Structure formats: structure tokens, C-alpha cells
């Protein structure tokens, strides 16, 4: 009888834990995805802060030339970064216990792998947690779908691209200048500016900013005034009120006359779907573009594509970009390569005699 009572108490304790994890009454929803999200993001954040402040230089290229990235080793907020794991490690899983010592682990850039892998797990679980909370509240699942765009972008630069290039040393450094360096080198090696998927991403980000500004300014300009002239119009809104807070007909009429009638939405639901879908689809395409360029399916190459009747090349902007790419590539990892990859890949002329 005592055993049965203990089992019931144990089940009751587990049941209470499950109810607490999945309760929507908590100030912050945890959820089953949160059980994994919280420790992974805490780990990634803690190691990032410590490494950004105090990590020793990392031999990123695997040629015994360490690169400093932390504040205590001479960097500032702009130049500092978590240096990617060494090319000597490649794609190997490199936890602390795989190194002979902590000093070796730090020298080979172990913190980068630790941060990136925990971060990707954490943001994926955050996306799952968004879906989980929506499900519990009876909401539609599109918040998690929208968040999948930045998750896909992060996975592309931190995981897919290193896999395609064969080393975590090719991943994006975790810092401001390191991000810019990654962008410049990516352009030099893959001509991303001439890739249609990147163009769609630019349209998505800048278009999304434009549409967001247009929508916000239109709504703010067509608020239904509930206050006197001496009070802020914002004070006329009560959280949870049933009445519309702005006049969509007035906004529709204004914008329809500013451009033309059918350029303006007359359905609030389709308008907000468009505002969400435009940047999300654009960022999806950019992440897909990064993931294909990871395996060297690069941007368009229109170099020397225009010639005159004598066969002489007439330079276009494509040739100017190509010249810039070669310049950036020859300066990249200058001690690791004697020539840019494009030049080194040219077949050597045959020698007779």
C-alpha cells in the first residue's frame, strides 16, 4: 500500500511539473521547447560575453598566425569578435574534452563552435516555443513561420556555409568588423551581388522597411480622435477596446489618391499578411542563396561578355565588379595563399622541350 501511494505522489509531482511547463498563466511561457532553449541560449550568451572580453588569439587559418579578437587583447567594440574555429579543426566536432588542454582549445577557436551550435539550437527552440504558445492559446501558427526567416539566415551563415566550404573557419565571425569581413570575402569568392536570390533578399529587407514606414505613418495620420486638442491622441486608446483606433477608409482614400486606387489595400487582413510575407519571403531566398553558394553555385558571371566587331572587350559594370572581387580576394588570407583562387585555378600552359 505504501508503494502505491509513493507512485501516485511521484506521478502527481511529474504532472504538476508538466502543468507548470505548459501553463499559459506564467509571466513568461516556458514550454517544452523552452526546456532546451533556456540552457542553450544561456550557455551561448555566457560564453560569448566571456570570450569577447578575454579569449586569447585564435589560429583561424591553421598556419600558426593567431588573430586577436577579444577586448583584453587590444580590440574595441567595433573591431572585437569571436574568431571562428581554426581551419586545422575543419568540420570536426571540437568540444573542450577533445583538446589536450583548455589552452589548446582556446588557441584553436573552440568557443566559436560552442557558441554557434548552442545558439542555433536555442533559436530553433525559440521558434518551436512560438508555435507551442500559439497552439496553447488557440492562435494561428504564422508567428513561428515568420521567425523561420532569420533562423534560416543564421543557419546559412553559421552552419550550412561552413559545411559547404569544409571548415568552421569559413563561418561568419561574431563581431561587427568580422561580419563586414565575412561579407567582403563572400562577395570576392561567390559574387553574391550578382545572385538573384540575394537581390530578392535586398528587395525584401528594404521593401519591408518601406512598407512598414508607410503603414505606420498612414495609421498614425488617420487616428480617430478621442481626446481634446490639449491631450495626446495616443491617450484616446484603451487596451482591448472594441472600436477601431484608426480610419482605414481614410487611409485607403489618401493612398489611393496619392498613387492610384488599386495600390492601396482595402482589407486590413490582407494588408498585414502582405507586410509579414514580403520581408519573410525575401530573407528565405537570401538564406537559400547563401546555402547554394556554400557549395560554390555562385552569382552570375558576365565578365567580358560585351565585345566589339574586332573582338575587343568593352568593359561593363560586371567587369568592374570582377576587378574589385579579385582585389578583395588577393588581400584575403594573404599569408595562406600565394594567388587568388580564380588565378590559381587557371590551367598551367604546357612546356615543350
Swiss-Prot record:
Pfam families linked: Photo_RC (PF00124)
Site location (Stabilizes free radical intermediate): 190
UniProt keyword Thylakoid present: yes
Main location as per UniProt: plastid
Binding sites annotated in the UniProt record for a quinone: 215, 264-265
Binding positions ([CaMn4O5] cluster): 170, 189, 332-333, 342, 344
Modified residues (Phosphothreonine): 2
Alphabetic keyword roster: Acetylation, Calcium, Chlorophyll, Chloroplast, Chromophore, Electron transport, Herbicide resistance, Iron, Magnesium, Manganese, Membrane, Metal-binding, Oxidoreductase, Phosphoprotein, Photosynthesis, Photosystem II, Plastid, Thylakoid, Transmembrane, Transmembrane helix, Transport
Membrane topology field: Multi-pass membrane protein
Subcellular location: Plastid, Chloroplast thylakoid membrane
Enzyme Commission no: 1.10.3.9
MF terms in GO: chlorophyll binding; electron transporter, transferring electrons within the cyclic electron transport pathway of photosynthesis activity; iron ion binding; oxidoreductase activity, acting on diphenols and related substances as donors, oxygen as acceptor; oxygen evolving activity
Site annotation Cleavage: residues: 344-345
Keyword Disulfide bond appears in the UniProt entry: no
Disulfide bridge positions per record: none
Miscellaneous comment as given in the Swiss-Prot or TrEMBL entry: 2 of the reaction center chlorophylls (ChlD1 and ChlD2) are entirely coordinated by water. Herbicides such as atrazine, BNT, diuron or ioxynil bind in the Q(B) binding site and block subsequent electron transfer.
Function: Photosystem II (PSII) is a light-driven water:plastoquinone oxidoreductase that uses light energy to abstract electrons from H(2)O, generating O(2) and a proton gradient subsequently used for ATP formation. It consists of a core antenna complex that captures photons, and an electron transfer chain that converts photonic excitation into a charge separation. The D1/D2 (PsbA/PsbD) reaction center heterodimer binds P680, the primary electron donor of PSII as well as several subsequent electron acceptors.
Name of the molecule in the record: Photosystem II protein D1
Organism this protein belongs to: Vitis vinifera
Lineage: Eukaryota, Viridiplantae, Streptophyta, Embryophyta, Tracheophyta
Gene that specifies this protein: psbA
Amino acid at each position: 500500500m505504501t508503494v502505491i501511494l509513493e507512485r501516485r505522489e511521484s506521478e502527481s509531482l511529474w504532472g504538476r511539473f508538466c502543468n507548470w511547463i505548459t501553463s499559459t498563466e506564467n509571466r513568461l511561457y516556458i514550454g517544452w521547447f523552452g526546456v532546451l532553449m533556456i540552457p542553450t541560449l544561456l550557455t551561448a550568451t555566457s560564453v560569448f560575453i566571456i570570450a569577447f572580453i578575454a579569449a586569447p588569439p585564435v589560429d583561424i587559418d591553421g598556419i600558426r598566425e593567431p588573430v586577436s579578437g577579444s577586448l583584453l587583447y587590444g580590440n574595441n567594440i567595433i573591431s572585437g569578435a569571436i574568431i571562428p574555429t581554426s581551419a586545422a579543426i575543419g568540420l570536426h566536432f571540437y568540444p573542450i574534452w577533445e583538446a589536450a588542454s583548455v589552452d589548446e582549445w582556446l588557441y584553436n577557436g573552440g568557443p566559436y563552435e560552442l557558441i554557434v551550435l548552442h545558439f542555433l539550437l536555442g533559436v530553433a527552440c525559440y521558434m518551436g516555443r512560438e508555435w507551442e504558445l500559439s497552439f496553447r492559446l488557440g492562435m494561428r501558427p504564422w508567428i513561428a513561420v515568420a521567425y523561420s526567416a532569420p533562423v534560416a539566415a543564421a543557419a546559412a551563415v553559421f552552419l550550412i556555409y561552413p559545411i559547404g566550404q569544409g571548415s568552421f573557419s569559413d563561418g561568419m565571425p561574431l563581431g561587427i568588423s568580422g561580419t563586414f569581413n565575412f561579407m567582403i570575402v563572400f562577395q570576392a569568392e561567390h559574387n553574391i551581388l550578382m545572385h538573384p536570390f540575394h537581390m530578392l533578399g535586398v528587395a525584401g529587407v528594404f521593401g519591408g522597411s518601406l512598407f512598414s514606414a508607410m503603414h505606420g505613418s498612414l495609421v498614425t495620420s488617420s487616428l480617430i480622435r478621442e481626446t481634446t486638442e490639449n491631450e495626446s491622441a495616443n491617450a484616446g486608446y484603451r487596451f482591448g477596446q472594441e472600436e477601431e483606433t484608426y480610419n482605414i477608409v481614410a487611409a485607403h482614400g489618401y493612398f489611393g489618391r496619392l498613387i492610384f486606387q488599386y495600390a492601396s489595400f482595402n482589407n486590413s487582413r490582407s494588408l498585414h499578411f502582405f507586410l509579414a510575407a514580403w520581408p519573410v519571403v525575401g530573407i528565405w531566398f537570401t538564406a537559400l542563396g547563401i546555402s547554394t553558394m556554400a557549395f560554390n553555385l555562385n552569382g552570375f558571371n558576365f565578365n567580358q561578355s560585351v565585345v566589339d566587331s574586332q573582338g575587343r572587350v568593352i568593359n561593363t559594370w560586371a567587369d568592374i565588379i570582377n576587378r574589385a572581387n579579385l582585389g578583395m580576394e588577393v588581400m584575403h588570407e594573404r599569408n595562406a595563399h600565394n594567388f587568388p583562387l580564380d588565378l590559381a585555378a587557371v590551367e598551367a600552359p604546357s612546356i615543350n622541350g
